Design a protein with these regions (language model features):
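Intrinsically disordered, low-complexity activation-like regions
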Residues: 30-227, 250-268, 280-295, 299, ...
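Short functional micro-motifs and their immediate structural scaffolds
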Residues: 11-14, 25, 31, 110-111
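Cys2His2 zinc-finger metal-binding sites
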Residues: 3-6, 20, 26
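C-terminal substrate/ligand-recognition segments
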Residues: 483, 487-508
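Specific register positions within alpha-helical solenoid repeats of the TPR/Sel1-like families, i.e.
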Residues: 229, 233, 290, 438, ...
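Structural signature of alpha-solenoid helical repeat junctions
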Residues: 216, 220, 277-280, 337, ...
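Long amphipathic alpha-helical scaffold regions
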Residues: 243, 268-273, 277
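Cys/His-coordinated zinc-binding microdomains
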Residues: 7-10, 21, 33-36
Length: 543
């Protein structure tokens, strides 16, 4: 694993893997001998443990993601498929706008590596120094586009360099990232494609059909490239580690400095595209650093950055945003982006509560805006496609929000009509509903509650379990591979149930995690899953 390297790595992370652990990680992540050339997801993670035969749920995702020997919880992306047949819209626009006179030949043909054309995929996403013409889709972007991107990359590099001068403790790590080639147009181009092809992993806040690296706020461009670089390094397709904790912290400061400036000017992301892009960048940084195995970074995100972003969203009214009838495509994109930024802020807050016992600052009750829309609507690449897909589907029926969903699933009554309404939620919706339940789990474990409260929550988890199989089965088989981290939601529900059942028991006294004390070392949660996660999941509450 190469992500998030730092000058003094041993002092920043839980511990460095020993020889045995390194060997185990190597065989787990790279069963295919020719991993640098192989892009077949079936050749990855072939040594994962088989599902238990006694009906218990395999918690391999939670164990892998929380394992402190990994530098990022996003290590699980190594097992994700890649949407190799797709090309981002800005690359298509570049190709369309590059015209050549009749009878002339594009000179880039003369520089092609013809051997690589025989492969389905480029040999190495990061091999730009040795073969800068082999990358994705054969053609590079037009010179004008490269020049614009190069100028933007240089601007970012210079800005962060100036910030590092005033932060001497961050300068060495930042210089290492520069020396390794992070701030190059070729790296940005390659990582943008890489992230685009794995955009399904997290439920995306980026609207890729209209995303343009030449025009988007440089703060957002930086956050996207940092996230894509983490993905790249989790697959070990990078010749060296581009990322250092110094680069991440400087980037985080840069993005939140701009956010504060806009808030001070009373700018609102509901009407300002630039501020919305800054909020997108903030969400990406919260997700990225919250997932990193860096204790201080995770503490900073949980205690400082997420609260700052939440305050901004509350002030702007983004948390309660809904779609309007007969929205134009442009209006839809902006409002749906607002909805997704609020949703992922809520999710990050929930995950900090689950993994770190960090008290959540948002409530499901205040989340009165729409749940994110279906991906087929979100990924419409034109106004015509949007209108065709959005008809009868954009204005949501009950339950349309986190607030309605969690109130309904916790309710005493669970009528046939309610069951039918909740049965229309798709797998992604249930992923969001799970995030709402995590706040109740935290409250149940850490506060004085009535004896009925744990039973109510167990009943809600059972209802969720009854909804998931049908929602999953409705997904076409070929599309299930694009479900991303949402496909692991049953594991979160299972460990939540186990935590509730342990409340007040003698066993609970042996678990550091169940003491409810905030800790930003994932080893504590990892040990809890190891110790209690594989217990029988029988004895569910009555619906």
């Amino acid at each position: 694993m190469l992500a998030l390297a730092a000058p003094d790595k041993a002092s920043l992370y839980h511990h460095r893997p020993n020889g045995a652990e390194s060997f185990e990680l190597a065989i787990t992540a790279h069963d295919c001998t020719y991993s640098a050339l192989c892009h077949d997801p079936s050749h990855r993670s072939m040594t994962k443990p088989a599902a238990p035969k006694d009906g218990r749920l395999n918690l391999s995702f939670l164990l892998l993601a929380s394992n402190p020997v990994h530098n990022s919880m996003d290590v699980t992306i190594a097992a994700e498929p890649e949407r190799t047949s797709e090309m981002p819209a800005w690359r298509q626009r570049d190709t369309e706008t590059t015209a050549w006179d009749v009878g002339t030949v594009d000179p880039r043909f003369l520089l092609l590596d013809l051997s690589d054309m025989l492969l389905d995929e480029p040999q190495n996403y990061c091999d730009t120094e040795n073969n800068s013409w082999q990358f994705s889709g054969i053609f590079n972007a037009p010179t004008t586009s490269v020049d614009i991107l190069s100028a933007r990359v240089a601007t970012l590099s210079n800005t962060l360099h100036d910030m590092a001068i005033n932060k001497p403790h961050l300068k060495q790590g930042f210089d290492q990232s520069c020396q390794r080639g992070f701030f190059t147009a070729s790296h940005f181009q390659n990582v943008l494609i890489f992230f685009f092809r794995r955009r399904h992993y997290h439920k995306d806040t980026i609207h890729w059909p209209t995303f343009d690296p030449d025009k988007v706020a440089v703060h957002s461009l930086l956050a996207v490239v940092l996230t894509g670089t983490v993905y790249l390094e989790c697959l070990d397709q990078s010749p060296s580690s581009y990322l250092t904790t110094s680069l991440l912290e400087l980037s985080e400061k840069y993005i939140y400095k701009e956010l504060k400036s806009l808030v001070d000017q009373n700018t609102t992301p509901v009407t300002s595209r630039h501020m919305l892009e800054i909020c997108q960048a903030a969400v990406l940084m919260n997700t990225l650093e919250g997932s990193s195995n860096h204790i201080e970074a995770r503490r900073r995100i949980a205690s400082k950055r997420i609260p700052t972003l939440v305050a901004t969203l509350r002030k702007s009214g983004m948390i309660g945003l809904k779609h309007l009838p007969d929205e134009s495509w442009e209006t839809f994109i902006h409002r749906e982006t607002c909805i997704r930024v609020a949703a992922w802020t809520f999710i990050n807050d929930s995950l900090m509560a689950l993994f770190c016992n960090n008290p959540p600052i948002m409530t499901a009750k205040e989340m009165t805006g729409y749940l994110p829309c279906a991906n087929d609507i979100w990924e419409a690449d034109s106004s015509v496609a949007f209108q065709e897909r959005a008809e009868q589907k954009l204005i949501r029926s009950y339950p349309s929000s986190y607030n309605e969903a969690v109130a309904g699933i916790l309710a005493d009554e669970w009528t046939a009509v309610m069951r039918e309404s909740f049965g229309k939620l798709d797998a992604s919706d249930l992923f969001y509903v799970c995030a709402s339940l995590l706040r109740h789990l935290f409250h149940c474990r850490t506060a004085a509650v009535s004896p009925d409260y744990p039973l109510m929550l167990l009943r809600a988890l059972d209802r969720w379990d009854s909804l998931w199989p049908d929602a999953y089965e409705r997904i076409p088989e070929d599309d299930r591979r694009w479900l991303g981290i949402a496909k692991h939601t049953p594991e979160v529900i299972a460990i939540s149930r186990r935590a509730i059942k342990l409340i007040g028991t003698e066993e609970a006294k042996t678990s550091a995690y169940l003491q409810g004390i905030a800790t930003y070392d994932t080893a504590v949660f990892h040990e809890f899953v190891q110790q209690f996660g594989q217990e029988s999941q029988g004895g569910k509450a009555k619906n």
